[in-house]
């Protein structure tokens, strides 16, 4: 539903239900969403048809962070990594978005695997992501680890960044290891958590955000009073009255239903994704990639880097290319490897008309 509120902390309050934890939506993102909302009102059928026919391929990096080399400790076998990757492409297929798995890293680091997602742990999160993150701001980095606090995942929204700054480093999604296909999280183990979180990474809000008086800022998702728990046999209608047409979108990936219940994004959500992509992430395509530093500070650290053959429509081939193990019984060990890619210069983009309308910063006459 089209509507906005001023603060959007994506933290579920339900017990024994899907829990997604997110940062408050930055004011600049809310402002951009309002602008996109105004533009949507002017969109005609041809504009929406153009959105439906558009396509996008996103470079993707998976990082598996575990306490030890066991499945219980958070280490995922290649088969489940492949299944999760294929689930993402299946879930986003109707939006025209596909993912290319560029690299899979595996890191054994108990502190990184178990830290809580809160403001007090930002330094640990920053250290982990600075060591593992790859690609430009247009590249998706997903960190699979045994999240605590009952959370299934957490992801950040797109916003203005400078290559390599703190906001750039903290970009990406953290997803509960047990939520991958075949994982041990009952009702949430078909890979849909990653789909939901990546929806946030692409600019989408929860369908129930703000209740009946709030909304996700997308016109074709009906108003919803509260998140869905489970998978109802019929769609409830929690926001009644002529001003709230439609029933709750319980099958939408941005609700909180069981994985088995989720299977769609709306056309309006697809348009919003491309709006945010063009505004925030597309300008970074082809730009210089940051220096990638691999480091760890636990008493026993194993880092395995694997590469994948980019495959979109078929099962990706995962091939291990290097394994590095450092251990000691007397003191912490720090391992660092630095890889620098030659920057590719890109011309500075011109200031678009919508930027002038939105922020009042315009071209010189």
Regions found by a protein language model. Name each.
Residues 163, 221-297, 360:
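Metalloprotease/metallohydrolase-associated module, dominated by Zn2+-dependent proteases
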Residues 1-19, 364-365:
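Fungal secretory targeting signals
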Residues 69-77, 183-188, 260-261:
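Second-shell loop/turn segments in exported
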Residues 82-230:
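Metzincin-family zinc-dependent endopeptidase catalytic domain
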Residues 16-138, 145-148, 290-308, 313-314, ...:
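Propeptide-to-catalytic entry region of secreted or membrane-anchored zinc metalloproteases
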Residues 289-365:
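Fungal extracellular serine/threonine-rich, low-complexity, intrinsically disordered "mucin-like" regions
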């Amino acid at each position: 539903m089209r509507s906005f509120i001023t603060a959007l902390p994506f933290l579920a309050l339900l017990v024994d239900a899907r829990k997604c934890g997110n940062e408050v939506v930055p004011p600049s993102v809310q402002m951009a969403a309002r602008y996109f909302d105004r533009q949507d009102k002017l969109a005609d059928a041809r504009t929406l048809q153009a959105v439906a026919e558009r396509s996008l391929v996103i470079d993707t990096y998976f990082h598996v962070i575990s306490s030890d080399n066991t499945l219980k400790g958070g280490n995922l076998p290649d088969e489940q990594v492949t299944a999760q990757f294929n689930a993402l492409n299946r879930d986003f297929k109707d939006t025209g978005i596909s993912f290319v798995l560029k690299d899979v890293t595996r890191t054994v680091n108990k502190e990184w695997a178990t830290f809580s997602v809160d403001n007090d742990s930002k330094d640990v999160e920053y250290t982990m992501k600075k060591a593992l993150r790859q690609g430009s701001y247009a590249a998706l980095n997903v960190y699979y680890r045994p999240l605590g606090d009952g959370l299934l995942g957490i992801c950040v929204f797109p916003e203005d960044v400078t290559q390599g700054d703190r906001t750039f480093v903290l970009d990406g999604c953290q997803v509960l290891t047990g939520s991958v296909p075949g994982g041990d999280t009952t009702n949430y183990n078909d890979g849909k958590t990653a789909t939901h979180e990546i929806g946030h990474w692409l600019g989408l809000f929860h369908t129930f955000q703000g209740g009946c008086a709030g909304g996700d800022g997308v016109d074709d998702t009906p108003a919803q009073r509260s998140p869905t728990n489970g998978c109802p046999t019929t769609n409830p209608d929690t926001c009644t009255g002529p001003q709230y047409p439609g029933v709750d979108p319980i099958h939408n990936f941005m609700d909180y239903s069981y994985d088995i219940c989720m299977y769609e994004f709306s056309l309006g959500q697809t348009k919003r994704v491309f709006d945010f992509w063009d505004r925030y992430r597309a300008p970074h395509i082809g730009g210089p990639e940051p220096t990638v530093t691999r480091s760890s500070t636990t008493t026993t650290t194993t880092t395995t880097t694997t590469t994948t053959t980019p495959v979109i429509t078929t099962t990706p081939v995962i091939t291990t290319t290097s394994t590095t193990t450092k251990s000691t019984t007397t003191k912490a060990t720090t391992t660092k490897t630095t890889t620098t890619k030659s920057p590719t210069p890109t011309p500075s983009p011109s200031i678009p008309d919508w930027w002038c309308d939105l922020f009042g910063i315009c071209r010189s006459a």
